[in-house]
């Protein structure tokens, strides 16, 4: 393993940051002027087919499946590898420069919504679907929604980065984040042993959020070689839940949605 001695004061280096070295910087804010297109639909979504972007596509397609016409949307592609997330219009919607982001034009004044979990909750509350009314049941859904938001970075930014994207394979970080990823998989597998969905009997935004990461991981759709490496075939309850959700018509459509170009 390479041995690293931290400097007294850290500074960014252009080299050796791996796949995302060309876009990562230690500063926030827009980097260039770029006007985003807007369609005629009530909801404008700026996103990409990553796990976090998939959450919103699934949610909107589920609302369409339920016949919610007010949830019609225009979907635009933000290419994170090209740095579209740092354009001025996008940063005005999401100052954190991450996808997905939503602009709701159905109100007197447009409302911006960013962070995938916030978008799921916003849409669920706005249209009164996929979240329980009962206070205790709603709280359980939110428990799992926020669990996903806090847990998944260990999978994506931790395991996924060092297993798939880092410029060199390092034993310590791969082992560290594999341990945590498998702990999370075991947690989900145990929770799903005696109920069809993560918060109980009903499919909710918590399932959408978790499936977009852990279901896709269980389908071997995120990181090449991860299914075997993580022994995902041993988490049978998680696999059953993954397949149950994968068969939903809205989920199938969400995986095939067309992202319009922004330029």
Swiss-Prot record:
CDD domains, A to Z = GST_N_Ure2p_like
Keywords assigned by UniProt? Transferase
Keyword hit for Oxidoreductase: no
Per UniProt, residues of the GST C-terminal domain are 134-263
Organism's domain of life? Bacteria
Which EC number(s) does UniProt give?
2.-.-.-
Q: Which SUPFAM superfamilies match?
A: GST C-terminal domain-like, Thioredoxin-like
Which stretches make up the GST N-terminal domain? 44-131
EC class, as a word, reads transferase
Miscellaneous remark of the record:
Part of the SMU_1296-SMU_1298 operon.
NCBIfam families from the entry?
Answer: PRK11752.1
Q: How does this chain assemble? A: Homodimer.
What protein family does this chain belong to?
Answer: Belongs to the GST superfamily.
Annotated protein name in UniProt: Uncharacterized GST-like protein SMU_1296
